[in-house]
């Protein structure tokens, strides 16, 4: 029996990556039990989570950039609107991560789940970082306005 853990511990990283992209026919030719090999599924989950990670990061980065530009212009009303939107986006993405994690928890094996949850924890921490950056920028704005008065 070949498992995901065996492949990644016994093979080099390059071989493991190359092996993960083999199709089902090639796996049958190698004489390996396909149901026991989690690498193709793990690779798909990995790529899917990486793609999912990029979209919220772009959105949050854009919102932070917009907030910083609004701070420079001292447009507080529009800033608060964008800040509110950014918090809503962070909450929605955070909920989606939890929901996706629950789905993964019921469908994947333990090592795959560990990798996928690791990526989701990283994504969650980046979203928290984006929200924190928004909070810091709002505090900066209010201090700047208070000192100006």
Curated annotation (Swiss-Prot):
The chain crosses the membrane at residues 39-61, 82-104, 119-141. Keywords: Cell membrane, Membrane, Transmembrane, Transmembrane helix. It is found in: Cell membrane. Disulfide bonds: none annotated. GO terms for cellular component: plasma membrane. It is a multi-pass membrane protein. To M.pneumoniae MPN_090. This is Uncharacterized protein MPN_129. It comes from Mycoplasma pneumoniae (strain ATCC 29342 / M129 / Subtype 1).
């Amino acid at each position: 029996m070949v498992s995901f853990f065996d492949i990644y511990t016994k093979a080099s990283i390059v071989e493991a990556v190359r092996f993960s992209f083999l199709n089902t026919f090639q796996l049958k030719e190698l004489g390996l039990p396909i149901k026991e090999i989690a690498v193709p599924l793990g690779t798909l989950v990995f790529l899917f989570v990486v793609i999912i990670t990029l979209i919220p990061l772009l959105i949050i980065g854009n919102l932070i950039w917009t907030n910083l530009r609004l701070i420079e212009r001292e447009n507080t009303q529009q800033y608060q609107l964008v800040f509110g939107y950014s918090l809503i986006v962070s909450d929605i993405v955070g909920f989606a991560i939890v929901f996706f994690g629950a789905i993964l928890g019921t469908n994947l094996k333990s090592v795959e789940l560990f990798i996928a949850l690791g990526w989701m924890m990283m994504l969650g921490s980046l979203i928290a970082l984006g929200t924190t950056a928004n909070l810091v920028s709002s505090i900066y704005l209010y201090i700047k306005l208070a000192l100006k008065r």
